[in-house]
Amino acid sequence: MGNNTESVATKAAKIKDLSKVIRVDADHLDHLLAEDAARIIEIISEEYQVILAAHSWYSRNFLPRAAARLDIALISDVLKIEANNIYTRAIYAGNVHARIQSNDPIQLLTVHSSLFEPISNEGGNAQIIIKDAPLPLNLTSWQSEKINKSDRPALTDAKIVISGGRSLGSEENFNNVLSPLVDEVGAALGATRAAVDAGYAPNEIQVGQTGVVVAPDLYIAVGVYGANQHVYGMKDSRVVVAINNDPDATIFQFADYGLVAYLFEAVPEMLNLIKE
């Protein structure tokens, strides 16, 4: 869905074991407003029994609208697909896993893609099917966007994520203490909601239930206490390292390795050791 999607569709067609790619292209889909995306899903759903998307900011915007148009339930936060209509999903900020059975004629899901093994982007030869886009609903209009460019890897793609909490105390400390370590190891920079709310870090790097969900090979939590909504966003990391001067910090319950130390001493020392 979108405008000028030919190259994306061609790339998607190479995914192994994929049989077809549906391409819906139109000028008015340049920014793909949520209500237009929901309408397209509604139309396409006539041919399918299961529709799923990665659990992301965008899917959480348009799929609930699509579910409402189809008069079915959206099953979000899916962690495991057990059968054709039985799923395990996260509730209560990931503290509880619920087993859900849906009897809707169409299964509409968002899944945590980081929990599933990636498939090959080569070797496929899917058929590309072009469908006409419905007329715009014109319920909302696009105003503007601001793209923050960074040489660092995206949070969702990074093998290493280093996140800072409110204990850093200021935006200056966030940049001066964490950034050198982040850049030295080629990591992505994350933040807790408390740090974002305090103005220490931008909203787009917030890790947690109301932010980005990550599952890197290594997650380093610096000055992070371990609120439920933050843990929800990083608990599936392969290895978790926590640095906090409070030995009772909740984050240590989820850490593979914990260091009880003042972050302003531990992080520079860690950086020096890595450089050596």
Listing of model-derived features with the role each one plays in the protein:
Residues 1-276:
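N-terminal glycine-rich FAD/FM-binding segment characteristic of electron-transfer flavoproteins
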